[in-house]
């Protein structure tokens, strides 16, 4: 308002901006026209008002052709309050001037509060200056907090949520580090063309094909989320993808990396590099750093920056395979739940597990056996989850009336047939999930059963002497590998292992040596390792 200009029409000096405006945001509604050169015949360098503001601002006043290029805006965003202020004033002025909206899409969002839901005030001591946040949590973590927030809810901003985000990002960091570490050992150097084509020239296992499909799925989900301008959906899709990649693919493929399985290297590299491209709009600095380690410094002809690589190509994922592994993972989760309920460690082998209600997992029995550390996996056999069922009289009474006592008696006798999704068939009637009340579980001796309404997983928890011995071997292997890590040994270093009175453990000598990279096993006074 302190800037004075000369009127180009009459030559009057000292012309000032009109001070009486209703609201700065209402006044700002003219921005799509005033800053883009609407109806301006020529481009004016150095300022607005036919050059009258020259040397007061470095901005140019574009010409009308420039306005036509950029009008209407693809996207504008501000707080919800701008619906009645800036968004409205832009729309009103634009319709009056050119009979057209000045934007193609609008995103409004709610307030930012502290992590406890209170407004931020300097006098309250809960205000976080931007410079402090940049220093303590980093720009990418700040961006993640903003983008992870559904726009119709208040953002609770603070160092607590930032710490949780860093914990999640550590999984991604460790996954990239895992591949880079083994790639450096084995000299793995893919070509940049492999990123567009996917893992080619190798025979992919079903697990590899699943990760390719999972990668294609996260690209599709992220693309849809960005097109809908809902970045919290992108982050949810990416977090689920990283969990699957780390806690399923890498964990189930570790030995393949020890043995330099080219298909595993190519598949994981493709998935990680593609995933970084997906998340780069949210966390540009970390994504670019990891890209350089994973791609730019490793692939001839690769763009130096992830932002020169473009968006991943959209492909149709194998939905059937994705559904199969999703069900397998759910079975494994239920099996681990049953182990936890029974108080049996995962390193303790068990004899068998029986699964009921599975539609897609029958071809993945070996994976289930390995994940749950059992010798046998059976489907649609074994004990059934015995859960006491009662009729929901409030819902069932009006529908079946006099037949309710018969249904109640049949439920008490355990004659209900599970139909999935909480539905049951009993006494000739099919009951919906809300027509049945599920009571306490009835225990079965020697078995622990976990049930989620569709799938039932029954775990045989009896441990004989053979299972107990194998459990001790697993515990020993875990302890020795922890000792290797604590001693700072490299992944490829060989050791000499000393066992105190090896006894029956030596019957599994070859297994122990293979899992601990031991060249030989000696018997001594205490458990010890030394570099071979």
Annotated model-derived regions:
Residues 65-82:
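A short glycine/serine-rich beta->alpha loop
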Residues 153-161:
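Short, solvent-exposed helix-loop connector elements
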Residues 1-32, 38-40, 97-136, 160-532:
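Feature 926 captures the class I aminoacyl-tRNA synthetase adenylation module centered on the KMSKS loop
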Residues 135-147:
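Short, solvent-exposed cationic patches
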Residues 89-96, 146:
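Short Ser/Thr-interspersed hydrophobic loop/turn segments at strand-loop and sheet-helix junctions
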Residues 85-89, 239:
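Conserved, well-structured core segments
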Residues 43, 59:
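Aromatic-residue-lined binding/catalytic grooves and analogous aromatic/hydrophobic interfacial grooves
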Residues 69-73, 126-127, 153:
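Flexible glycine/proline-enriched surface loops and loop-helix/loop-strand junctions
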